Amino acid sequence: PVATLAKAQELARRFTSETDVDIVLEDGTYYLPETFVLTVEDSKTYSSKVTYRARNEGKVIISGGWKLDLKWNKGEKGIWSALIDEDVYIDQLYVNGERKRMARYPNAIPGEGRNVYDTWVLNHSVEESGQEDALAQSRIDRWSNPERGYVHTMHNALWGDMHWVIKGKNSDNTLELEGGWQNNRPSSMHTVYRMVENIKEELDAPGEWFYDKQERKLYYMPETSEQMDKVTVEIV
């Protein structure tokens, strides 16, 4: 037995091209530190083959994610934090195998049918949402460092959505944005259907997270069912 797919591949290549090779994966998760590549070196003749298979169907996961070993500290307002030793980029966070949401505003609302950013039910005649605009200047003023945050809005005529990366703040404290070209008919932002995420100050709901890349610190507000000394954390 060997511990990694890479080692199994190395051993399989030692057999002649006329030999069938059966690589059997035991139950569990196999994390790939780099892309697993099959090349001509892994090929056999037409009458022979190399097979990668699970010993027990459905019990093996090959993951491109990275499992983190973290020491969590409880902070204020139900938010926990942990330092990450390596310099990482986090696009997605999984806790106990469940994908979590970046810190965002407005928050997602549980339930079926909320087809606009998991917050609203699409209404073509909507004029106001009854809550503060995600891009209200008073809200932006509260963000200490929104760089690497995201702005998502619907096209003003609801012909799709558009997205921006926040590059920082301008001298007048407005946002410096890059993007918005995702629709073939440019338009202004929709006045209601707007959402921001990956903003530290918007971390206020269970299941939300924020990663401070400068401090290498991950912030997370756990669900009521999660015990932070026992959770499994994976990133992509």
Region roles according to the model:
Residues 1-236:
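Extracellular polysaccharide-degrading/modifying enzymes targeting complex plant/algal/animal polysaccharides
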